[in-house]
From Swiss-Prot:
<keyword id="KW-0479">Metal-binding</keyword>
<feature type="binding site">
    <location>
        <position position="133"/>
    </location>
    <ligand>
        <name>Fe cation</name>
    </ligand>
</feature>
<dbReference type="InterPro" id="IPR023635">
    <property type="entry name" value="Peptide_deformylase"/>
</dbReference>
<comment type="similarity">
    <text>Belongs to the polypeptide deformylase family.</text>
</comment>
<comment type="function">
    <text>Removes the formyl group from the N-terminal Met of newly synthesized proteins. Requires at least a dipeptide for an efficient rate of reaction. N-terminal L-methionine is a prerequisite for activity but the enzyme has broad specificity at other positions.</text>
</comment>
<dbReference type="InterPro" id="IPR036821">
    <property type="entry name" value="Peptide_deformylase_sf"/>
</dbReference>
<protein>
    <recommendedName>
        <fullName>Peptide deformylase</fullName>
        <ecNumber>3.5.1.88</ecNumber>
    </recommendedName>
</protein>
<dbReference type="GO" id="GO:0046872">
    <property type="term" value="F:metal ion binding"/>
</dbReference>
<dbReference type="GO" id="GO:0042586">
    <property type="term" value="F:peptide deformylase activity"/>
</dbReference>
<keyword id="KW-0648">Protein biosynthesis</keyword>
<feature type="active site">
    <location>
        <position position="134"/>
    </location>
</feature>
<dbReference type="GO" id="GO:0043686">
    <property type="term" value="P:co-translational protein modification"/>
</dbReference>
<keyword id="KW-0408">Iron</keyword>
<dbReference type="GO" id="GO:0006412">
    <property type="term" value="P:translation"/>
</dbReference>
<dbReference type="Pfam" id="PF01327">
    <property type="entry name" value="Pep_deformylase"/>
</dbReference>
<feature type="binding site">
    <location>
        <position position="137"/>
    </location>
    <ligand>
        <name>Fe cation</name>
    </ligand>
</feature>
<feature type="binding site">
    <location>
        <position position="91"/>
    </location>
    <ligand>
        <name>Fe cation</name>
    </ligand>
</feature>
Length: 174
């Protein structure tokens, strides 16, 4: 397994729409393993393939406190959604940024698992938020798209400033 690089906003590759996976094979399973390693190391609860520059319809998730409930969703589709609530969301592609986003309270998702077997799962709470957030990534949509243009611009400027500062510090350290 190998840790992957998580793309950071405003990288335009985060806007690419992911392509359907036609066959679940060893290459896809290897990507899944690497994505789990990356997600756990970055202390996330979900990671879409597009966030690691793999533009396929796949995401991994583990919303458990002990990181012992790994879930794989290949070609996911939300088939039911009900209720609405706002909750703070963060994202590995937006380090240190959190914002209130409105999502469906309860959902049902259909997808393929790591073995290519179709399954359906209902979710609420953090898992429902995570599934909706990661599917948005696969569609080229980011959680900041739910915010006002002013808030989006402030976040973009903040992250660009932090990136410049990190690059300057790295150059000075050499």
């Amino acid at each position: 397994m190998a840790k992957m690089t998580v793309l950071q906003y405003p990288d335009e590759r985060l806007r690419k729409v992911a392509q359907k996976i036609e066959k679940v094979d060893d290459n896809i399973r290897s990507v899944i393993d690497d994505m789990f390693e990356t997600m756990y190391e970055e202390q996330g609860v979900g990671l879409a393939a597009t966030q690691v520059d793999v533009h396929r319809r796949l995401f991994v998730s583990d919303c458990s406190e002990d990181q012992n409930e790994p879930l794989v969703f290949i070609n996911p589709e939300i088939t039911e959604a009900e209720g609405h609530f706002k909750n703070d969301e963060g994202c590995l592609s937006f380090p240190g940024v959190y914002a209130k986003v409105e999502r469906a309270e309860r959902i049902t998702v259909t997808a393929l698992d790591k073995n290519g077997e179709r399954f359906s799962r209902s979710a609420e709470g953090l898992l429902a938020i995570c599934i909706q957030h990661e599917i948005d990534h696969l569609d080229g949509k980011l959680f900041v798209d739910y915010l006002s243009p002013l808030k989006r611009e402030r976040i973009r400027k903040k992250l660009e400033k932090e990136q410049r500062l990190a690059e300057k510090q790295a150059a000075e350290a050499q």
